[in-house]
Amino acid sequence: MFRTPQARLPARPCGGRRGILAAGLAVLLSACSGTLSSSDMFGTSSVAPAGAEQAAQSAIGTGQTKVGLLLPLSAPGNAGLAGQAMRNAAELAFAEFNNANIQLLVKDDGGTAQGAQQAAQQAIDEGAEIILGPLFAQSVTAAAQAARARGVPVIAFSTDSNVAGRGIFLLSFLPESDVDRIVGYAIAQGRRSFVGFVPDSPYGSVVEAEFKQVVARKGGRVVAVERYAADGSKMTEPARLVAEAAARADVLFIPDSGDGAVAAAKALGAAGLDAKRLQVIGTGQWDDPRVFAEPALEGGWYPAPDSGGFRAFSARYRTRYGQDPVRTATLAYDAVALVAALAKTQGDKRFSPETLTNPSGFAGIDGVFRFRADGTNQRGLAVLKATPSGGQMVAPAPRSFGGSGT
């Protein structure tokens, strides 16, 4: 199913139309060949966007299938940096795909909802059959209004699953996938009782809801969940309650990043909880040097994509553009590789719901992924262990999906 970057012809069919689709696209998308956190989604590059105005008015390629690409090219700060890096990644994907029969209509949405709606409308008026982007949740909602009115699907990059829906698919790293993977792994290792210490934030609300659902679905039980102020204040009382409940649990869930996870661990320690007695787990936000340096979190498990694909992509990006890509750049690369593969192999059904929600999924830079009918996605993630020297692999990312994608 997976081939080297040079192998770009469809693989041997594995049975049925969807089997052929899965096999062929896995090879096509492997032409490139980890987890985004809310705190680092735009990376740390200090290089300003180059030629944003010119890029906003340009097209990439001259193929028959037109594809809208909406990015915050002229947005201030890190958003603009991300937009330019994602445009570069889209260009790189096009260049590396063998005879891509697509034309990318690059539109600058300015990082605003109004800009996104206008950009989507313009791309559709110019013949776009599918929209890639935007990046921000409010922009996705606005672009979706224009796209739905014309029956044009959207593959967006927001991490807010609330904006997904009929015809609006999210390619981003969603916290729900993180929770599903890490809880599932813990239960597979014989853990059954969970206690959660969760930041009181929109992100915390999402992961808490998913945490409770996944634990119940997989046959475990949640002993208690306590919330703490996202700014790290007033942790004493909720930490005390978690420490008491932890006596009846064998897993401690701390879904926070960097300083937040460290502060939570210290507060629990001050409340008398011995984290070494439990298996501590987190989300992809743990992929952070501050987490690795915290003794109370050492040995904790967290999910992340296999880093090999991103390292290889970064090297090629650096060679072409002279700087490191932001982490979101892989989303644009995979989106372009996906639509190029679909345009090449799927004829008139290239962007149909059936094609996009193929349960066998697709292979990209960061591993396998598939879209669900509700517009969210599932990703094949590895499980890593936090150590002072960084994340250490304890379970590899799956290379294929089993079961339906619903």
Regions found by a protein language model. Give the residues of each.
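Extracytoplasmic "Venus flytrap"
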Residues: 48-88, 107, 113, 328
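Extracellular/periplasmic periplasmic-binding protein-like sensory domains
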Residues: 261-333, 346-347, 397, 401-404
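Bacterial signal peptide processing site
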Residues: 33-36
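An alpha-beta-alpha
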Residues: 170-227
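Segments of small-molecule ligand-sensing domains
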Residues: 321-395, 404-406
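C-terminal motif of bacterial Sec signal peptides marking the signal peptidase cleavage site
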Residues: 28-31
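Periplasmic-binding protein-like
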Residues: 123-135, 154-157, 193-198, 246-261, ...
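Beta-alpha junction/loop-to-helix N-cap segments that form part of ligand/metal-binding clefts
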Residues: 84-85, 96-162, 172
